[in-house]
Amino acid sequence: EMSASLVGSEMCIRDSPESVLTGEVGNMIIENFLNDIAGIKTTKTKSAALPDSERVELKKYLKIVCDGKSLTEDEAYKAMDIIMSDRASNAQIACLLTALRMKGETIDEITGFAKVMREKMSKVNVKGTLDIVGTGGDLSNSFNISTTSSFVIAAAGQKVAKHGNRSVSSKSGAADVLEALGVKIQSTHEQAEKSLDEIGLSFLFAQSYHSAMRFVGPTRAQIGVRTVFNILGPLANPAKADFMILGTYDPDLLEPMAKVLMNLGIKRAMLVYGNDRLDEVSISAPTTICEVNGGKLIKYEIKPEDFGLKRGKLADIVGDDGKGNAAITRGILEGTIKGAKRDIVLLNSGCALYICGKCDSIEEGVKTAAEMIDSGKALKKLEELVELTNRG
């Protein structure tokens, strides 16, 4: 039986889920990794004060994964619930994350993990929202394309619940650029709901909505390698967005991530991979798309030229730090920045307007996006968000 699994950010197809991580040998390999490489002592953990009856809960799931086997969705759900309820030690968490990466995370495992994150998060109760987000890790150092696109999409009448964080691997995360634009990024779920109702746009700062992540953060920082959490973030939008544009730098993640979104009940989504390794719809290469629509997966490829846009170069969309990228975003919305930077925003916005049903095609979406910028409506959305979030 063929089994598909995700290794951090890579997908492995193999004939069986068995691996070298079996029995005592597997446990020894992982413990040596934790002690010698990650610097996490397995004998001294933050949860040492917990009674043994609580600290042993995760062990049966650790054994399954360390034996090279995969968790069922229900087992993955229970394991993540233990972790995000502060009932596991740092070493146990590190062991599980490392073993999962070495084995390769399955669609069922990611689905189970994501369901727990969505249950534990502070929720924003507004229906019909869209999120446009990337997994990161494409190493392109591009400006904040999806954040800039959010203003264009909202100007066209689609509610955007932009979920994001500060920079981790790049110079500027969504939170960094919005803060530099004058947006107050910290918000309660009530404030976010008000913003979505009043102006059709809100930034959902991940740290404000995922308090249970504090039980995982220190371990992730100490491990210092990609884990399943790198792809869980986009799957846990506090508004449970009905529509999504989700970019990845790895084409092998397209179909698995699409299937996870289907498991989570997404209405329509577009998983995108720029063939130049961009986790956005690319202006400098064809883009491979896996569209989720009506419970079906449709895979196809698009090019900038298909929509009357001139192909650019990756160097044309390189960004800066938060302040520099804020200037790029404002320049595009004001109409002073043209060329590839504007065009890639039009392309990504156009795809979003198509996937949420505001436009009947990507081509129509691109034209609508251009109208939103040229009319000043997209810039007005930025000004409205700044004013609303800073209101006393």
Spans of features found by a protein language model:
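Glycine-rich anion-binding loops and their surrounding alpha/beta cores
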Residues: 119-122, 142, 157, 179-186, ...
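Catalytic-loop motifs flanking and including active-site residues across diverse enzymes
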Residues: 25, 29, 145-149, 173-174, ...
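A glycine-rich phosphate/pyrophosphate-binding beta-strand-loop-alpha-helix module
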Residues: 97, 143-199
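Acidic, glycine/proline-rich low-complexity segments that act as flexible tails and inter-domain linkers
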Residues: 51-142, 154-156, 160, 311-319, ...
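Short, small-residue-biased leader/transition segments that mark boundaries at the very start
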Residues: 1-13
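Acidic, glycine-rich active-site loops and adjacent beta-strand->loop/helix elements
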Residues: 134-139, 164-170, 209, 275-276
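Active-site glycine-centered loops adjacent to acidic/histidine catalytic or metal-binding residues
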Residues: 16, 137, 233
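Acyltransferase
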Residues: 17-51
